[in-house]
């Protein structure tokens, strides 16, 4: 049975070059529907409640623009999100080459390199038009410390898995940070107790010396 938690809101950002199918991927996940035609996105926000590993989450998904003229807006989008899905098209070598640019922008804005990022190669149903091999995608993701999947917004292949795994990555990072905080608190308490113990010993030794003099 799924259980609810107060911290079940997860904010995800979809990024990538223009025309790779970011909106198609998002809408397929949200509404089980493939959109053939749509206007270029500037910024659209979607919400979906889903159950992942017996926990209920509300996903707040930001579908962003890929156009160069909107680059200045990305910093704001990046700061508002916890996890990222970087999309390229397997039929477009240039969109694949842009992935590293988007990742570097995320790292720069957040000023850390442990960001949960899923890289996906969309349009896996168009294998006869492929310009980027699966192995190339896998190798780049491993090199840059990202998760990786190929997907098809049209056939829905791996769409659910992409978002589920990205949420898991976000939660794993949160748990890791929480453990570090608890460990630090524990060390601080031990250090404080050690100082108090030494001070008490010093006071007791002083009292003993005074008694001997008397």
UniProtKB/Swiss-Prot annotation:
Q: Which InterPro entries match?
A: P-loop_NTPase, Small_GTP-bd, Small_GTPase, Small_GTPase_Ras-type
**GO cellular component labels:** plasma membrane
Keyword Membrane in the entry? The reply is yes
Residues that the record marks as modified (Cysteine methyl ester) are 211
> What SMART domains does the database record attribute to this sequence?
RAB (SM00175), RAN (SM00176), RAS (SM00173), RHO (SM00174)
- Where do we find the motif Effector region here? 38-46
| Protein name from the UniProt record | Ras-like protein rasZ
Taxonomy, top ranks, is: Eukaryota, Amoebozoa, Evosea, Eumycetozoa, Dictyostelia
């Amino acid at each position: 049975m799924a259980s609810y938690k107060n911290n079940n809101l997860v904010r995800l950002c979809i990024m990538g070059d223009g025309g790779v199918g970011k909106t198609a991927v998002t809408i397929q996940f949200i509404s089980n529907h493939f959109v053939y035609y749509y206007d270029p996105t500037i910024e659209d926000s979607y919400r979906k409640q889903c159950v992942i590993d017996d926990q209920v989450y509300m996903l707040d998904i930001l579908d962003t623009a890929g156009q160069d003229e909107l680059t200045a807006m990305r910093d704001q989008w990046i700061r508002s999100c916890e996890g990222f899905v970087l999309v390229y098209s397997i039929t477009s070598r240039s969109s694949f080459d842009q992935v590293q640019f988007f990742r570097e922008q995320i790292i720069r804005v957040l000023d850390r390199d442990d960001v949960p990022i899923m890289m996906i190669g969309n349009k896996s149903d168009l294998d006869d038009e492929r310009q980027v091999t699966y192995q190339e995608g896998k190798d780049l993701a491993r090199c840059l410390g990202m998760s990786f999947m190929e997907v098809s917004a049209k056939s829905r292949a791996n769409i659910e898995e992409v978002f589920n795994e990205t949420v898991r990555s976000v939660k794993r990072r949160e748990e890791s940070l929480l453990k570090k905080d608890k460990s630090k608190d524990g060390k601080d308490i031990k250090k404080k107790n050690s100082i108090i113990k030494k001070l008490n010993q010093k006071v007791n030794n002083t009292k003993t010396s005074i008694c001997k003099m008397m």
